[in-house]
């Protein structure tokens, strides 16, 4: 990567069905992470609603602040991706302004974005 790309603010938006090769310093947002966390909390629950509620509440307590942060961050990340107008995954966003779609190799996507920026200042 060129120094500009390495120093750039890089956000990768994907999901578990579209794995990416991230680069150091890039933040990866998985759009299906909130659903996966909810599935973890709901795994193997009994049919009785009262028992299921008690078990989920226990799991939330046991997860503590770390689980709460994880859930909150997952939803914040999804909201950020929507706010950026991400239309499909994988997407690589540089400096919250330039977006490349469809490239799972983040370094290659950033290089393409940088090449575009050089030829279209």
Language-model-derived ranges and their functions:
Residues 5-49, 53:
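N-terminal secretory signal peptides
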Residues 102-121:
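C-terminal partner/receptor-binding element of secreted or periplasmic proteins
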Residues 89-100:
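A short, hydrophobic beta-strand/beta-hairpin element that forms part of a small beta-sheet core
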Residues 63-86:
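Thioredoxin-like thiol-disulfide oxidoreductase module
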Residues 57-63:
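Acidic/histidine-rich, surface-exposed loop or edge segments in extracytoplasmic proteins
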């Amino acid at each position: 990567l060129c120094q500009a790309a390495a120093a750039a603010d890089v956000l990768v938006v994907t999901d578990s069905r579209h794995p990416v090769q991230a680069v150091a310093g890039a933040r990866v947002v998985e759009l299906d992470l909130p659903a996966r966390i909810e599935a973890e909390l709901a795994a193997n629950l009994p049919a009785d609603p009262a028992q299921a509620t008690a078990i989920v509440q226990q799991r939330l307590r046991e997860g503590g602040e770390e689980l709460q942060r994880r859930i909150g961050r997952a939803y914040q990340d999804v909201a950020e991706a929507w706010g950026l107008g991400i239309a499909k995954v994988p997407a690589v966003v540089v400096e919250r302004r330039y977006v490349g779609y469809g490239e799972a190799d983040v370094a290659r996507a950033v290089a393409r974005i940088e090449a575009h920026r050089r030829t279209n200042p």
